Amino acid sequence: MRTGIIAQKIGMTSVFNDKGERISLTLVKVDGCQVVGHKTLAKHGYNALVIGVKDQKISRVTKPMKQVFANAKISPKTKLKEFRISEDNFIDIASILEVDHFSVGQFVDITATTIGKGFAGSMKRHNFRGLEASHGVSISHRSHGSTGQRQDPGKVFKGKKMAGHMGCNQVTIQNLKIFAIDTNRKLIMIQGSIPGHKNSYLLVKDAIKKASITI
């Protein structure tokens, strides 16, 4: 099991293949992704790499983290993330991970935070059909309708789909295929859409449920 990387979502575009089919692509940039530290089985109980990205002002770093970055002999980072790895996949501290960490045709899993939508109704949040547009319905056309039963149980069960805060959740999209890699621009072109807004940070890992390379 290899380490993943922290990347930045740039935006979306589309291309046409040899068959004339339109393929949607998400552009992901890998820039300054660096190994900050190691977690070992003997000391911490598991094997992992600590990956950092985006330089930070030294004045905004806490004293304990200043020592961590000083020991690694690298500049402070804003984003830090641990990636579990197998024992034979350690990478030297201060090493920089580039786009060639992955290959064209490989399947990856993307973890990102969805765009926040604020307080949303049941029709937008849970795809409810709503009530009738006429025939006796007043002021409640987009409401969710009944939420409970009767005197027994006399309550609304936890988990009932209702209006509430929508979005801003961490989700993982699995088995997305890498269409192309641009080493000069440090871009990975991934087929399909990825959660999150432009310039948001996300995690790219080898697909756990699918073969890494297609033949």
Curated annotation (Swiss-Prot):
<keyword id="KW-0488">Methylation</keyword>
<protein>
    <recommendedName>
        <fullName>Large ribosomal subunit protein uL3</fullName>
    </recommendedName>
</protein>
<dbReference type="InterPro" id="IPR000597">
    <property type="entry name" value="Ribosomal_uL3"/>
</dbReference>
<feature type="region of interest" description="Disordered">
    <location>
        <begin position="136"/>
        <end position="155"/>
    </location>
</feature>
<dbReference type="GO" id="GO:1990904">
    <property type="term" value="C:ribonucleoprotein complex"/>
</dbReference>
<dbReference type="GO" id="GO:0003735">
    <property type="term" value="F:structural constituent of ribosome"/>
</dbReference>
<dbReference type="GO" id="GO:0019843">
    <property type="term" value="F:rRNA binding"/>
</dbReference>
<dbReference type="Pfam" id="PF00297">
    <property type="entry name" value="Ribosomal_L3"/>
</dbReference>
<dbReference type="GO" id="GO:0005840">
    <property type="term" value="C:ribosome"/>
</dbReference>
<comment type="similarity">
    <text>Belongs to the universal ribosomal protein uL3 family.</text>
</comment>
<keyword id="KW-0699">rRNA-binding</keyword>
<comment type="function">
    <text>One of the primary rRNA binding proteins, it binds directly near the 3'-end of the 23S rRNA, where it nucleates assembly of the 50S subunit.</text>
</comment>
<dbReference type="InterPro" id="IPR019927">
    <property type="entry name" value="Ribosomal_uL3_bac/org-type"/>
</dbReference>
<keyword id="KW-0694">RNA-binding</keyword>
<keyword id="KW-0687">Ribonucleoprotein</keyword>
<dbReference type="InterPro" id="IPR019926">
    <property type="entry name" value="Ribosomal_uL3_CS"/>
</dbReference>
<feature type="modified residue" description="N5-methylglutamine">
    <location>
        <position position="151"/>
    </location>
</feature>
<dbReference type="GO" id="GO:0006412">
    <property type="term" value="P:translation"/>
</dbReference>
<comment type="subunit">
    <text>Part of the 50S ribosomal subunit. Forms a cluster with proteins L14 and L19.</text>
</comment>
<keyword id="KW-0689">Ribosomal protein</keyword>
<dbReference type="InterPro" id="IPR009000">
    <property type="entry name" value="Transl_B-barrel_sf"/>
</dbReference>
